[in-house]
């Protein structure tokens, strides 16, 4: 099954997941939204009933955004989820939007469809570059917060890119990558490529958040979309595995097109999800700093048991989601 992963860092640290129904002219989809987005205007990762999935990472080394229109990545992805069935539909949507004026984005968009086509689209206001998955070594593409088409300057997140590449090297080589590889591995790992060690695994008591490891204080979600196998109905079998709040301490709950786990839904005041609110409170208890000019320090001693608790809870979330999917596949095969 194809996988699309997003480890989200954002100033909008409370998120929720919800389903948006189809209309006469748009597709149904399920996506991650910022808390408070009652109109579901900006999707940050999601998939639709046709099996098209999309996410983004902000890019800081593409052409400077001088347009009055900006920060439209979530709006672009919402439109893509409403209308795109194939990966090629997404680039066609970008072509149409660019022809009308500045797109208002500086982003790496990752996307795939139910036919197995996919890749990264590094996109700025007036142009984009496609990196097809079919041409990628080992069948995987990794992006942080810079674009390969953007040159050598301002490669924000370069160390985190190296972190992810190092942590994925063995699973890719052994062809053992699963959703858990990301939510239970990379999003909980404090591996630093420059030091060649995982600080959460070698007895370190505290670590400074300097933006050089995958989890950060501003990490608000870890999400993996798992695509359909050939012949499956994506509307019935695709799953979005979602860890909200602070991913190292949180746990995974499943979201399907017609079935979203209650902990992910915006059931609290202000369109907030219970899991997000709970885990952000936990996060706040783990970080401290001397003053506003000092880096945030994470208490690894307190975090370690929470990581293990989260993994146990995630195992149950994966079990429930897979049981539901397997039942649907079984029912379809007997009809």
Regions flagged by a language model, labelled:
Residues 74-107, 112:
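Intrinsically disordered, low-complexity linker/loop segments enriched in Gly/Pro
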């Amino acid at each position: 099954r194809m996988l699309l992963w997003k480890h989200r860092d954002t100033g909008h640290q409370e998120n929720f997941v919800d389903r948006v129904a189809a209309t006469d002219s748009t597709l149904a989809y399920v996506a991650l939204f910022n808390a408070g987005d009652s109109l579901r205007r900006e999707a940050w990762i999601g998939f639709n009933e046709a099996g098209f999935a999309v996410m983004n990472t902000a890019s800081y080394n593409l052409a400077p955004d001088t347009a009055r229109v900006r920060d439209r990545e979530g709006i672009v992805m919402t439109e893509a989820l409403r209308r795109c069935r194939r990966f090629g539909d997404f680039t066609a949507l970008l072509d149409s939007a660019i022809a009308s004026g500045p797109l208002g984005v500086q982003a790496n968009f990752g996307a795939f469809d139910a036919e197995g086509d996919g890749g990264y689209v590094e996109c700025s206001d007036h142009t984009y570059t496609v990196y097809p998955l079919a041409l990628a070594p080992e069948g995987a593409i990794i992006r942080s917060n810079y674009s390969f088409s953007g040159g050598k300057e301002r490669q924000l997140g370069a160390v985190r890119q190296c972190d992810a590449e190092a942590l994925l090297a063995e699973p890719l080589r052994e062809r053992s990558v699963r959703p858990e590889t990301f939510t239970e591995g990379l999003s909980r790992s404090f591996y630093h490529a420059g030091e060649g060690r995982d600080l959460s695994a070698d007895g370190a008591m505290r670590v400074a958040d300097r933006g050089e490891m995958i989890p950060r204080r501003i990490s608000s979600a870890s999400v993996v979309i798992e695509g359909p196998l050939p012949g499956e109905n994506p509307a019935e079998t695709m799953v979005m595995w979602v860890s909200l709040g602070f991913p190292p301490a949180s746990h995974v709950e499943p979201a399907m097109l017609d079935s979203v786990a209650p902990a992910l839904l915006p059931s609290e005041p202000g369109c907030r999800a219970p899991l997000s609110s709970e885990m952000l409170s936990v996060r706040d208890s783990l970080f401290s700093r001397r003053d506003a000019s000092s880096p945030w320090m994470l208490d690894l001693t307190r975090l370690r048991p929470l990581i293990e608790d989260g993994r146990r809870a995630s195992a149950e979330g994966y079990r429930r989601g897979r049981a539901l999917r397997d039942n649907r596949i079984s029912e379809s095969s007997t009809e």
